[in-house]
A protein has these predicted regions:
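Macrodomain-like recognition of ADP-ribose-binding/processing modules
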Residues: 1-193
Length: 193
């Protein structure tokens, strides 16, 4: 089956009770789906809906260029650097949801439900969206309405991403000038991972 068929079934469920029509183009369908799942506030999503989303995401992943995490060069391989841990740290620019690796690191919100604003392009929203609704449901189940503190982590499966696991870390939310406390918490966030 075509990925559009699976996505159509997911959108029908997500749009129940609204006046919103499902777009005809796959691009517009994906944009709408991304917006809806970012703001998803439903529990007990039927298994057939989750299964259809899984099928859509797996077919979509087949058409995306994946990056082998093992082949991303570390800082020590690309720069003449004496930075601590430079043999273990890599800088890479691209879509993190296309990295084939054992683990991805996600800087996330204290409630572990991801960015709820539907902001395209945020790391957190990309990871939560591309892994599928199962990730938000699992995090909601684990957290039970509680929050983690800055620098704390939670490890989950990666579901429909090409990685096995996600380490979610709460980083300080900085609004305005960066304080010394912000710097210490950010450093601790990295060290905890």
């Amino acid at each position: 089956m075509d990925k559009k068929v699976y996505l159509d079934k997911v959108l029908k469920y997500l749009l129940e009770g609204t006046d919103v029509d499902i777009p005809s183009s796959i691009k517009d369908m994906i944009d709408l789906w991304e917006e809806l799942v970012a703001k998803l506030d439903k529990d007990n999503i039927p298994s057939d809906v989750l299964s259809n989303e899984d099928k859509f995401l797996r077919l979509d992943l087949l058409n995306r260029k994946l990056t082998d995490g093992e082949k991303i060069k570390t800082i020590s391989e690309t720069l003449d650097s004496d930075i601590d841990y430079c043999t273990k740290i890599a800088l890479w620019k691209g879509d993190i949801t296309t990295i084939y690796a054992d683990v991805l690191v996600n800087s996330t919100t204290k409630d572990m439900l991801g960015c709820r604003e539907g902001i395209k392009g945020t790391l957190d929203n990309s990871i939560f969206t591309r892994s599928g609704m199962r990730l938000r449901l699992k995090c909601r189940d684990i957290m039970q309405g509680e929050e983690l503190n800055n620098t704390e982590i939670l490890v989950t499966r990666a579901y429909n991403l090409p990685s096995d696991f996600i380490i979610h870390v709460v980083v300080p939310c900085i609004d305005g000038d960066i304080t010394e406390e912000n710097k210490v918490e950010l450093k601790m966030s990295y060290l905890n991972v």
